[in-house]
Regions:
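C-terminal cap/substrate-recognition subdomain and adjoining C-terminal extension
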Residues: 1-2, 75, 82-187
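Active-site phosphate/ATP/adenylate-binding loop shared across adenylate-forming ligases
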Residues: 48, 64, 68, 134
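Acidic/polar active-site rim loop that often engages polyanionic ligands
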Residues: 19, 57-58, 135-137
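Metal-dependent phosphoesterase signature
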Residues: 56-92
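Electropositive phosphate-/nucleotide-binding environments in soluble metabolic enzymes
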Residues: 13-16, 51, 67, 147-150
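Conserved alpha/beta cores of soluble small-molecule-handling proteins
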Residues: 3, 31-32, 43, 49-52, ...
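Active-site neighborhood of HAD-like aspartate-dependent phosphohydrolases
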Residues: 1-49
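A general alpha-helix detector
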Residues: 21-22, 41, 60, 76, ...
Length: 187
């Protein structure tokens, strides 16, 4: 029987949200224009007013990536993860994550953040990743937040044909959107 250790990312393992610094970095490197930043801000504003979905806001924020070559996207995404996100991990959070891995638990980042840069974070930490996928056409798939985190976790467990001891499993989060995942686990 497997036990899991599940970690939200933004606000739990790092301070704040990761997509805004990602967009700022893309702009600073010349990959995203000021117009792209304005489109992202507009998308976020419309989302907050409940006039757009989270998926639409993420798609709009990341639309500049469609103009980049695959190599340029990989360089931007990997560089952001290595040079910005990983150095900003809360030391106690990283220590906790690594301790769970050393204890033999299956460890996963479960995040609404997009996979284009989160995959580099997960790979560097040696953990699995369940997050919002960016489709080949640049659109964001279903936002991995709230009850969607639980749905994705159950699919992840079924895909691996694991039997999970949910009462002995751990979940870490910092917001209301993490509550369904937190309620799933005993710790």
């Amino acid at each position: 029987m497997e036990t899991l250790a599940l970690f939200d990312f933004d606000g739990t393992l790092i301070r704040g949200d990761s997509i805004v610094p990602y967009l700022c970095r893309a702009h600073a490197q010349g990959d995203a224009s000021l117009g792209d930043l304005m489109a992202a801000a507009t998308g976020y504003f419309l989302f907050r007013l409940h006039l757009r979905t989270a998926e639409e806001a993420k798609t709009r924020a990341l639309q500049f990536r469609r103009r980049l070559s695959p190599a340029r996207r990989d360089a931007l995404d990997g560089g952001f993860a290595r040079e910005y996100l990983l150095p900003r991990l809360y030391p106690a959070g990283k220590e906790c994550l690594l301790a769970h891995a050393q204890a033999g638990r299956r460890v996963a980042l479960v995040s609404a953040s997009p996979d284009n840069y989160m995959r580099y974070v997960a790979a560097a930490l040696g953990v699995d990743l369940i997050c919002t996928r960016i489709l080949p056409d640049g659109r964001a798939d279903v936002n991995c937040s709230g009850q969607e985190k639980v749905r994705r976790l159950r699919a992840y467990v079924a895909q691996h044909a694991w039997t999970v001891d949910w009462q002995a499993s751990y979940a870490y989060g910092d917001s209301r959107s993490d509550m369904p995942m937190l309620r799933l686990c005993g710790h």
